[in-house]
């Protein structure tokens, strides 16, 4: 099957281009692996750098090496060849940037299933909070501002890459997968696998994640900024804290928004680590926390109350916190026993929670042509 698809790359490029529009028209042809007689950068934007641990035609063997080589201005694209990359990645350049994970033509057009089974690129590390390390310093992948800058990347995109923090097989402390702060960043068809604090949208961060899966146990969607998760799978590896743990800011819509998604017991969990009705949708990091679930399937692991207080002496959810649901489904989507402070939205009320509404306009840094 692989050879047949490779043959198509040689003789039917026009037909192939029509196929790749099912993913992202701008980049999918670039992402497909090519026959050895063709450049791996066929179909890529001009100036694209190629990273590979095995292909001698690569410009670099490390993702971070490629990033450090980039000029400070202009749009930059990096294609990452198939492989497992043990490194931390830190992006501080301000101009637009794209990271592309290579795809096998034989599986690239299969439904992702939000498990990223078609992804060929993994970036991992294993740091966790110890010996004075901060949360942010444990992140496998960071997009933030550089020294002296007011803001970082204005338009970062990543496609079909699996990011993982392998600090432990069970939460031992905070161990981030991502840190997106002072930047606009979007992710397509990716996986983020961790335990505690997997996903972090930090101060002045704006993030969009689609067609992806996020694994975690404790507060694994947390932060200060604005994060929209569209058509994702949230996979509970265990039940600790809540899925979301946000710190809101007065007068803003900073929060976590989960739409058209699924919450499930992680495939690597068991009945001991994820028991029925024990996982909470969130807990408030401060009393202005925002978390909204729209049209989301929730399995039997979700607690009937939905949300819980922070704990550690904060034993109530204040009415300044905004927790809300609309059209939840599945065994855990029964809203009859939700905490009284939660907002159970009507169809009219739910209409205010859109990408454009949350980000105060249509974000130019989101690839709306990406199709699931």
PLM features: residue spans?
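Sequence-level preference for short, compositionally simple segments enriched
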Residues: 23-372
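Fungal secretory targeting signals
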Residues: 1-25
